[in-house]
Design a protein with these regions (language model features):
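P-loop NTPase catalytic core
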Residues: 175, 182-186, 191-422
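Basic helix-extension-helix modules of the SAP/HeH family
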Residues: 1-47
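P-loop NTP-binding catalytic core
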Residues: 93, 108-177
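Short acidic, glycine/proline-enriched loop segments that cap or flank alpha-helices
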Residues: 5-6, 25-28, 108-112, 369-373
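Flexible glycine-/small-residue-rich
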Residues: 40, 55-61, 68-71, 85, ...
Length: 422
């Protein structure tokens, strides 16, 4: 039996499941969910002698660790599984490793509270004895993105078609979506995520929502069911925002070390930076907007982890940055991150107010070394379009309106580019 299946059940479903193992309903009604799960696992262990569990490792300062559950957003929970320092040292396990193994229920007479890992079966889908071969993420060679992530997947999804031409995203891209309030940022992130899931099922996609509203989290999970949506809502403490983001990053790094392509969509880098500003010890130096001088170090490490790896694999991070919120802190955070990315997509509030969606500022949006991602025809046509726009003095409103109309009349970008000739 797999413990993760139990974790997904509601309390009522657990009650029905418990009856199959002789746990009486009148008894189970008086116990908590964790105790009920432990009773089921003990009964299963007594009958079959083997219980399988899976989780993502978080190592602690004392040397031991716990397997955290995706269902609890990798935060501390009653379903966590203890893993001993000896096992961590023996296999060279790291935070973020996805571990599958045999576990046993806690011993009441020893005062144990958590399930314990008995035997490791796989680490990141591979045999644990092969772990000594894997490299460290920081030792891998970063290069410019040279393989485009094609976001075009439906004729009516105009935003992803425009991104494909104006600011293409490659494997290993470090991209910023610069967005004022109510400019269509969330819808755009959902379309980007759906395009990746549709066109690249082999890419592991994480959507990390920090300091978001709970209903936004539910909507994201329903709109992008194929992605792993991890969230720390605004009613959580800042240290939990930081813990969740670090766990997602470490899990992504472990996958990249195994030569997988990983994408993290972060909403938003601004709120993550705000959380670190409250968590880091005060340095005594306060910058513009109340930002501590040490606060942005870890958010920059998060964003800077995005890279295309020469040895194989890539980590792509697309993060939203909030501007024009009326907060000097938000503006300062954007200014600090502005030069660190190699792709920027700007959304315009004026276009959104005119109900022009996607409200993309084509003139301000671009990708560094886009020649490595675009075809020769795409590159020449887009350069000609930008040059024509500047020479004719065409304003942004008129340009995006024309582009949207032309794209609505064509089925794909290849047909749109042919239309530009006329």
């Amino acid at each position: 039996m797999h413990i993760s299946k139990l974790s997904c059940l509601t309390f009522e479903e657990l009650l029905e499941f418990a009856e199959g193992y002789g746990i009486k309903k009148d008894t189970s009604n008086n116990i908590r969910r964790q105790e009920l799960m432990q009773a089921i696992v003990r009964a299963q262990h007594a009958m079959e002698g083997k219980i399988i569990a899976e989780g993502t490792l978080e190592t602690l300062q004392d040397g031991f660790g716990f397997l955290r559950s995706q269902n609890s957003n990798y935060l501390v929970g009653p379903d966590d599984i203890y893993i001993s320092p000896a096992q961590i040292r023996l296999f060279g396990l790291r935070t973020g490793d996805i571990i599958t193994g045999e576990v046993r229920p806690p011993k009441d007479n020893a005062g144990e509270k958590f399930f314990a890992l008995l035997k490791i079966l796989t680490v990141n889908g591979e045999e644990p004895n092969n772990l000594y071969k894997r490299p460290h993420f920081d030792k891998l060679t970063p290069i410019f993105p040279n393989e485009r992530i094609d976001l075009e997947f439906a004729p009516n999804k105009i935003s992803t078609r425009i991104i494909n031409l104006v600011s293409p995203i490659g494997k290993g891209q470090r991209g910023l979506i610069v967005a004022p309030p109510k400019a269509g940022k969330t819808m755009m992130l959902q379309e980007i995520a759906n395009a990746i899931c549709r066109n690249y099922p082999d890419i592991k996609l994480f959507i990390l929502l920090i300091d978001e509203r709970p209903e936004e989290v539910t909507d994201m999970k329903r709109q992008v069911p194929e992605a792993e949506v991890i969230a720390s809502t605004f009613d959580e403490t800042p240290d939990k925002h930081c813990q969740v983001s670090e766990m997602v990053l470490e899990k992504a790094k472990r996958l990249v070390e195994n030569k997988h392509d990983v994408v993290i969509i972060l909403d938003s880098i601004t709120r993550l930076s705000r959380a670190y500003n409250l968590v880091v010890p005060a340095s005594g130096k306060v910058l513009t907007g109340g930002v501590d001088s040490n606060a942005l170090h870890k958010p920059k490490r998060f964003f800077g982890a995005a890279r295309n790896i020469e040895e194989g694999g890539s980590l792509t991070i697309i993060a939203s940055a909030l501007v024009d919120t009326g907060s000097k802190m938000d503006d300062y955070i954007y200014e600090e991150f502005k030069g660190t990315g190699n792709m920027e997509l700007h959304l315009d509030r004026k276009l959104a107010n005119r109900r022009l969606f996607p409200a993309i500022d084509i003139d301000s949006s671009s990708t560094r070394r886009e020649d490595l991602l675009l075809t020769e025809e795409e590159k020449n046509k887009m350069w000609a379009l930008r040059k024509y726009m500047q020479s004719q003095g065409i304003d942004e409103d008129q340009l995006i309106e024309t582009v949207i109309d032309k794209m609505n009349s064509t089925k794909d970008n290849a047909e749109f580019l042919k239309l530009l000739n006329s």
